[in-house]
Amino acid sequence: MENITKTFQYGGVDWLCEPWVGAGSLGIGRGENPLKFALPLLLLQISVFSIFSVSFQFLLRPFGKFAFLTQMLAGICLGPSVIGRNKQYMATFFYARSVYIIESFEAICFLFICYITTCQVDTRMIKRVGKLAFINGILLFLIPFVWGQFAAILISKRLKSGPAGIPPVEFHHVAIVQSTMFFQVVYGVLSSLKMLNTEPGRLALASMMVHDCLSWCFFMLNIAIKLNVDLPNKNRAAFLSVLQMIMILVIAYVFRPLMLWMKNRTPEGHSLKASYLSVICVLLFISCLWAEFVGLPYFFGAVVLGLATPKRPPLGTGLSDKIGCFVWSVLMPCYVIGIGLNIDLSLFSWRDVIRFELLFGVVRFAKMIAIALPSLYYKVPLWHAILVGFIVNIQGLYDVQIYKQNFNYTKISSKSFGAMVMSATVNSTIFIVIVKKLYQTMSKRNPYKRRTVQHCRVEAPLRILTCFRNREAVRPVLDLVELSRPAIGSPLSVFAVNLEELNNHSLPLLIHHTQEISPFLVPSRRDQIVKAFHNFEKTNQETVLIECFTAVAPRKTMHEDVCAIAFDQETDIVILTLDAGIELWERLLCRNLLHNCPCSVALFIDRGRLPDFRFVPLKKLTINIGAIFLGGPDDREMLAYATRLASHPSVELQVFRLVDQNGVSPLRDMVERNHDMRVINVFRKENSEKNIIFREVRIEEAVNLLDLLRKEGDDFDLMMVGIRHEENLLMLEGLSEWSDMKELGEVGDVLISKDLELSVSVLAVQQ
């Protein structure tokens, strides 16, 4: 090699000496080859990797997003399996010094990955896992390990030998390593598939958390035993064990309080100072260096520090946002290049592939069995158990790094390492596709009957699911429940769902609050919400039944919990309560509910017009409700719910039926017009009470409708509208062009617009 000046052996190790020429090059113009300098070569390697990775992403885009697959393929292409067959290329791009630099960046990348993923894991969640997840975790730890060892013995004996050049001891070690799993990998995959707050996702995460706890305990025990066996000086072994315990204690009782101090010094809503971030990086490097000094893998220090990091922002997820971009964009290419350099596919024959895959297949099947048996015993649906089995079989960067650690310590050969990485890459991609398709099939919720207010019999109990995202929304929700409460007859069933964003938790949660709140404890925010609903239920025991839930989920999939509860509880209508300041992600939540709910959906925009029923006697209250009826299924559903509200003694209902200049329905669809006419006739016949007024208003164009709303709108406390209407209605023409929130429909959107300057609360309904 051109840069080598001396090669010699010392202590049985080959030493390679090169002259130090600096990190940066003066450039081609001054007669220097930039590829002989560390920095230009590193930048070129990262650039080439990025080109390959983006190219694979583009080619695979029609089939979905496969980040792990595209990264591994790019790394393998840069290694000896593809381009690396050219010796000149390897000598230019990956000579000895550049490989050392790549491997150094690879280690730094993985310790950062360990930290930013582990610092989002809330260890308190282990207390909340159920009995099934606990059993799953134990069996996931035991069964793949045992079955893997038996499979290694049988393959070696029945097939007369394992893969060529792989001794039996190494083959057994491959089986042990293959049985490992990582919570962080499953968390990342479920997050990308938007399955974190699904039932299979929760079970998989909880089971993996138990498995990881057992694995780390076993890992520490194995390290302690290895130190005692390998070190002839028992006092030195004991001393190293003590230093390991001291490291954990220092991280827990020195580093953690320091990070808590940084958190408390950071104003709420602000990100960490750059100086604080630098201190945390120093703590990370100290932890990893200490782990290396006391005989532990360097990433163990990163994992322990991540677990000790406070989970509340600006730490936890805040750190991930701060460091993540640099890690995934700059360090990750170095990591994958280092992996690809050690994979040479030309070493494999079909005989080797079959033997390796037989072993890996047995271990994967063992993981499926470990999930399926207890799940079926606890009456989990078969397809849910199969789905969880596929999820826990997905592998990722953590698994690859464990393979690399074993390769570095010469416990497995280059052939075994390549087989494990390729198998993890290919099979995990297949499993991700299977999980995605299976879940899409399972998540289609088709109710066996029409679940709407219109089709709910008058004598049957109305079942309402009301969801909200903050404590301030509890009062308007209870106001709406009070208005929906029947004076006599079957009780109203209410399912109250408190929606919390998944930003301070490691696991999505769906909590069913069934126990009374202890009066001797300081109530949390959740407890205060639950207590408010329970107090309302006690006050109206004969007419209202309330169940409370808390759903902690990512914003993008928050609707999944609402839809699941609505389906399981067979609700007739879901009501989402929002205040006037609607955020962009809340509009996404509205759209998801409107598209996916198995029953009717209502969007309630509270503007403070409804009174607080807790402090004013019902006899002294008058609630004025207006209903705008154009026609169509949504308007019929709205009218059915308005009729229910009108049965409340404090409600005065006024229905505006909008007709054209000829006094007939503006709809062109004759079937819908006939349905509307039948509903209107029944409504007028059965609701001739003094508290209900029915008016027909002739509207020629949108300007007349705006004049009506501007004139009458503020006379009401609540205005009810349908969301969807027939397209190209003359009286709605042009209203959608200045839309503020099209999820409410044209009329609902106009009611909350700033142009009309109305203060009425709005309830928009979709059947």
Swiss-Prot record:
Bilayer disposition of the protein: Multi-pass membrane protein
InterPro entries, per database record: Cation/H_exchanger_TM, CPA2_transporter, Na+/solute_symporter_sf
Gene Ontology annotations for the cellular component aspect, listed alphabetically: membrane
Tissues in which the protein is found: Specifically expressed in pollen.
Compartments, record wording: Membrane
GO-annotated molecular function: antiporter activity
Keyword field: Antiport, Ion transport, Membrane, Potassium, Potassium transport, Transmembrane, Transmembrane helix, Transport
Disulfide bonds: none
Major localisation: membrane
GO BP annotations, alphabetical order: potassium ion transport; proton transmembrane transport
Transmembrane segments: 39-59, 63-83, 99-119, 135-155, 173-193, 205-225, 242-262, 280-300, 323-343, 371-391, 415-435
Family of the protein in this entry: Belongs to the monovalent cation:proton antiporter 2 (CPA2) transporter (TC 2.A.37) family. CHX (TC 2.A.37.4) subfamily.
Function field: May operate as a cation/H(+) antiporter.
Name used for this protein in its record: Cation/H(+) antiporter 27
Gene: CHX27
